[in-house]
Amino acid sequence: ISISSDFVLVRVVNVINLGRMGYLRANDVQMRHARQHLDELAGKPSSKGTNVLFLVEHTPVYTVGLRNQQYSHEDAFRLKSLGAEYYKTNRGGLITFHGPGQLVAYPVLNLQHFKPSMKWYISALENTLIKTCQKFGITARTTADTGVWVEDRKIASIGVHGSRFVTTHGCSLNSNIDLNWYKHIIPCGLHGKEVTSLTKETGQEVPLSDTISPFLSSFQEIFDCDLEYNLLEAHEMEELITNQHVLTQRMQNIQQSVRQMSTSAVHQPQAAEPIIANPMW
């Protein structure tokens, strides 16, 4: 949360583009940022959570969610023999694929700053993806099945986890991904369903880089927040991946000035929420 010059509370989300990265490395980054939120909620003195939207393009990987009983060690070996990694996760949902040409978004948010409801959160992700597709002239929708669909073809997946309304994992949108990877699995456990992409639906090449701006503007509108992003230098990115120092260091002075502003602001009846100010990309 940030405070504008006229003392209006504004939700601010950092956007950090991790580029192309393996699944485990990106997972570690988001989990450590989620821990900052949880430690702050637990009252740990030096912990300050930051609302962050991580964007990443994964190297080939199959991941399974909590309902993974149908996938055996033999299945894992078979999928890894294709040249992909394979991991079990604590997100909701069944098996899916991530790889080059797919935009993956991991919002690490304290939903107390938005709406403390996982149902609302999933709906907000769905609407963000639908609006992104609309920007490419594609009519997408939700169905009784998970994810976002173009008619009966799945173009985006959602699999999230929440702890004390702190979110991890997120969603993925197929841009120009190689759809052959999906032929080796039953995506999200849905038999007889086709997987599609922006490239396939539009009939022209849509590189992943072209999906970032439409996705971010859709996210900003649906989540009713401001986005802050700065390009990190190589050494800053490496430091971000290995520890929390980059965010913590950049936030200290800003948070102090925001708190000083808040003490002189008109009293807010529900001002128990932590104040978070954010610069990052």
Describe every region a protein language model picked out:
Residues 1-155, 206, 238-281:
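N-terminal lobe of the biotin/lipoate ligase/transferase fold
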Residues 70-73, 158-175:
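Short, conserved beta-strand/beta-arch hydrophobic-aromatic motifs that form part
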Residues 107-109, 162, 173-177, 199-202, ...:
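Short, structured patches in soluble enzyme cores that scaffold and shape functional sites
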Residues 139-143, 224-233:
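Flexible, glycine/charged-enriched surface loops at secondary-structure junctions
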Residues 180-223:
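A hydrophobic, small-residue-rich beta->alpha segment in the mid-to-C-terminal subdomain
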